[in-house]
A protein has these predicted regions:
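Short beta-strand micro-motifs enriched in acidic
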Residues: 48-52
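Short, well-ordered strand-loop elements centered on a beta-strand within folded domains, enriched
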Residues: 53-64
């Protein structure tokens, strides 16, 4: 079965990316889904969902080695300020940290 993945973020995802100020956040495709993404070195942030008005956002923090989710925030409303606050907290805790510091 082939799934169609749009090449661009949805308008709501673009709004969030613009609110976050663009760089260091960017568009990426993870598991066939357009997501907002940020590389933190040993960790990655994936912001998925939010494609439609009724679809909530989810934030996942991934450890790259071994590949696993270490933190998740799900069912987040389209509240850009709240999402940015969560992301700022995540960045402060995970940016340029070694994997074992969060165990």
């Amino acid at each position: 079965m082939t799934f169609y993945t749009p090449k661009n973020l949805s308008p709501r995802q673009k709004d969030l990316l613009n609110y976050l100020g663009g760089k260091p956040y960017c568009k990426n495709i993870i598991d066939g889904e357009n997501v907002v993404y940020r590389d933190l070195g040993v960790y990655d942030i994936e912001i998925s969902g939010g494609h439609r008005k009724t679809q909530t956002f989810a934030i996942y923090v991934w450890c790259k080695e071994p590949l696993r989710i270490v933190e998740r925030h799900v069912r987040l409303p389209h509240d850009h300020a709240m999402i940015k606050d969560i992301l700022d907290d995540i960045v402060a805790r995970y940016s340029d940290k070694e994997e074992n510091e969060h165990e």
